[in-house]
Regions:
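Glycine-centered loop/turn motifs
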Residues: 1-7, 117, 205-213
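Catalytic P-loop NTP-binding/switch module of NTPases
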Residues: 1-42, 99
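Surface-exposed loop/turn and secondary-structure junction residues enriched for glycine/proline
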Residues: 7-9, 44, 125, 133, ...
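Generic structural motif
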Residues: 12-19, 66, 192-195
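Noncatalytic linker/hinge segments flanking ATPase motor cores
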Residues: 25-28, 110-112, 173-181
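Intrinsically disordered, low-complexity, polar/charged repeat-rich segments
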Residues: 29-32, 36, 40-45, 131, ...
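Carbohydrate-recognition loop of C-type lectin domains
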Residues: 42-172
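An aromatic-glycine-centered, glycine-rich loop/turn in mixed alpha/beta architecture
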Residues: 147-219
Length: 219
């Protein structure tokens, strides 16, 4: 959409926002601050350990989650796999921003936040599209047209919850039972049967994959 500058910019005639490269972030809420404070007693960060990399990465604007991989390509190598602040796949711009902060040339010379001798590589996850098929029974006065937006919102919220928890899990699993429960929570839905994910059962992802919702087919 159109962008209106707050202050006068010489030579600017029009500006449009085409896509988001790095998401803005809301102020930290009280519960998040409390959890972060409690976690600070469980692990101690010092230069170059996993906790230090974790905390410094999350301190960079636009980063929502990170997994730190030590010695991923031999001694002295570190990989930071990140999500953006809405827990999606990071853009190239965000990856480059984090890379410049830690180790601009990936050579371990200590030109960024990483200690000398730590060659850091920043990467992001792969997205796995999950297509869903389900047969849904509706209550009197409801049908697909009236329930479809709420159904797909409920499924999206489940997927968003999985992505938000990615940092804390060794791998994510998209479960039929959880999708059925999300659908059943929609007003007007009385039953859901025969649910499949990508034509089969639960979808088990690798450690560095996150799910995104594909096509929902209604039986």
């Amino acid at each position: 959409g159109d962008v209106i500058p707050v202050e006068y910019v010489m030579g600017l005639t029009t500006a449009k926002l085409t896509r988001v490269l790095i998401y803005g972030e809301d102020d930290e809420d009280t519960e998040t601050l409390r959890l972060r404070y409690q976690e600070s007693f469980n692990e101690r960060a010092f230069a170059g350990n996993a906790k230090d990399y974790h905390d410094k990465t999350l301190g960079i604007a636009g980063v929502g989650a990170v997994k730190v991989i030590r010695a991923w390509n031999g001694p002295g190598t570190v990989k930071l796999v990140i999500l953006d602040s809405v827990f999606g796949k990071a853009t190239d711009v965000l990856i480059q921003t984090v890379q410049k902060e830690f180790d601009p040339n990936k050579d371990g010379h200590g030109d960024g936040l990483a200690p000398i001798g730590h060659a850091v590589t920043v990467d992001t996850v792969s997205e796995v599209t999950v297509n869903i098929a389900a047969t849904i029974t509706y209550d009197n006065g409801y049908d697909l047209n009236t329930c479809k937006p709420q159904i797909e919102t409920a499924i999206e919220e489940y997927f968003a919850g999985l992505r938000k928890n990615w940092e804390n899990q060794s791998k994510l699993v998209v479960r039929i039972a959880s999708i059925d429960a999300a659908i059943m929570g929609v007003k007007g839905v009385v039953d859901v049967t025969g649910t499949t994910l990508n034509g089969g059962g639960n979808v088990e992802l690798t450690e560095y994959e996150i799910p995104v919702l594909g096509v929902v087919t209604y039986g």
